[in-house]
């Protein structure tokens, strides 16, 4: 038997290998809700334009609603012989209401149908991601507020650089997630044009109303060019690009969590309910959730690479290659949401070891920059001169195996005679962070203001 929906030109049916490589219902059934929404909007338009009768439209819409309930209750049998979600639904509709079902496909193609379905699905996914990122930002704010003045070492090159506060450090990730959310919002606006009614590629001779379908489905307008409408997958590429940037941010935080809970750092302790053990080493408590976030980052990156490679050589308009757009999209979205949830769970199940953070912040001459700044302010040196002198003082402390503030004033005056005892006031980690009051700096008073601004942002974007 040839395919019941496109087999008129064929005398034999597809062989098993062709069916196997051609089917997409095994994964595009995830689009059933969007496909039915698109079909209902298209059907309403056909009725409004008197292309089909009101009675026919009612039959079709009722049938589609029944099919949706069947799918959601698990009572719908998908068939690989029918290739994809569109044909599975249409064939089931035909069995239910007869040949009238065939009128639903008037003035449309699977090409514009799938493009519309995918945009609807991505819009829904953006809303889910926004909700999850909002929760994660709220968690970061809560921890930052509890630790707005908790001192920890700031790092460059993974070497202790300057003291900062944990609240300030976590608010850096809050800002990253703000940018991530902004990118999702920008994508939503840019992609919110409706491909429905573009048909295969050239539009249609039927007197359709594309503006009606666009409005019915919540789009801002119809797409402007029918060829572009069915061949465009920019919105998938942008979605995966945004997902890649977002998961990269999560991966950086995951890497820090892995470091911080290690024996060498001991900055944090992860709860048992978000860690795992070893099958051979009974003492182990592994940060597997963080490691899996880090690992899944490569998986999401590869999804973006996948679709870029698929699209790079395709002539206009539609090619079957584009069927390969869905699995990486669905996989990336599913894993990104899981990673956001896992990160949120980890952060809600950590204990901050503040004393260890402070001890680490006081090591490796972390206040050397404060000393250099003091020399500029009080001895009237250029920063380059103070940098050179501070380097000599650090070298002296290293030679004496002590911290800078443990050097005596006499020892310091051998390097720079005009230095006074006031210099010791800037050499503690606490005084260092308190002094960093420049806009966006790590001073606790700044962190509290940033947290306040963050809460206003979350209220306005809830």
UniProtKB/Swiss-Prot annotation:
Cross-referenced Gene3D superfamilies: Fumarase/aspartase (C-terminal domain), Fumarase/aspartase (Central domain), Fumarase/aspartase (N-terminal domain)
Coiled coil start-end: none
The protein's annotated pathway: Amino-acid biosynthesis; L-arginine biosynthesis; L-arginine from L-ornithine and carbamoyl phosphate: step 3/3
Primary location recorded for the protein, binned into one broad class: cytoplasm
Keyword Amino-acid biosynthesis in record: yes
Record field: catalytic activity: 2-(N(omega)-L-arginino)succinate = fumarate + L-arginine
Entry's EC annotation: 4.3.2.1
One GO BP: arginine biosynthetic process via ornithine
GO cellular component, one term: cytosol
Listed Pfam families: ASL_C2, Lyase_1
InterPro entries listed in its UniProt record: Arg_succ_lyase_C, Argininosuccinate_lyase, Fumarase/histidase_N, Fumarate_lyase_CS, Fumarate_lyase_fam, Fumarate_lyase_N, L-Aspartase-like
Subcellular location: Cytoplasm
Keyword Amino-acid biosynthesis among record annotations: yes
UniProt-recorded Gene Ontology molecular function terms: argininosuccinate lyase activity
Domain of life: Bacteria
Keywords: Amino-acid biosynthesis, Arginine biosynthesis, Cytoplasm, Lyase
Protein family: Belongs to the lyase 1 family. Argininosuccinate lyase subfamily.
Cross-referenced NCBIfam families: argH
Protein name: Argininosuccinate lyase
Gene name of this polypeptide: argH
